[in-house]
């Protein structure tokens, strides 16, 4: 099985409050934390690998649990996406659970000793929201600038990106992973 030095993932988190407006379940199938933890990500991670994992603040505890289950150690927040509205440069605000949410975070975790290639990559991503849960394309560019042109895969991918292997239920996957095309 091919090993990757970069794993980029935007899991389809299942929320306890699935009836709220904008709930992920209305847009795509979600997975429980147990289902996510059971994915054999350890099998595709190189001995020196970096994981970029999108998480929302209500799922932060589960994201840290998932990082550990996949064999990684949490290090930092790689990126903070400050969301703008689609049609104007004003800030986008979701309903939120307590306060009106805007930012989403991409956590950084490592296995072994991956090496950073650049110290010039900034944490903030200021970009409009697009389709539900789609992350800014510039994230992949920032990952490559930070880590270099290494073997990489995007889990739960929605699109094909040159140079990236992909796995997800919304696209034709390149590989087999967890008994499914990847």
Describe the residue ranges of each PLM region.
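Class I S-adenosyl-L-methionine-dependent methyltransferase catalytic core
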Residues: 1-182
């Amino acid at each position: 099985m091919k090993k990757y030095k970069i794993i980029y993932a935007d899991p389809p988190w299942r929320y306890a409050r699935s009836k709220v407006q904008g709930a992920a379940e209305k847009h795509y199938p979600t997975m429980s934390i147990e289902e996510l933890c059971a994915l054999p990500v350890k099998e595709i991670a190189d001995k020196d690998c970096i994981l970029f994992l999108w998480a929302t603040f209500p799922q932060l505890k589960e994201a840290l649990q998932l990082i550990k289950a996949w064999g990684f150690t949490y290090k930092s927040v790689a990126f903070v996406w400050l969301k703008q509205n689609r049609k104007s440069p004003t800030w986008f605000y979701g309903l939120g659970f307590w306060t009106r949410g805007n930012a989403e975070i991409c956590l950084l975790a490592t296995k072994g000793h991956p090496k950073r290639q650049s110290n010039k990559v900034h944490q903030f991503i200021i970009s409009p929201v697009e389709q539900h849960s789609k992350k800014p394309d510039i994230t992949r560019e920032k990952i490559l600038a930070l880590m270099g042109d290494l073997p990489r895969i995007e889990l739960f991918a929605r699109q094909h990106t040159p140079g990236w292997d992909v796995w997800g239920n919304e696209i034709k996957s390149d590989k087999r992973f967890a008994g499914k095309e990847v």
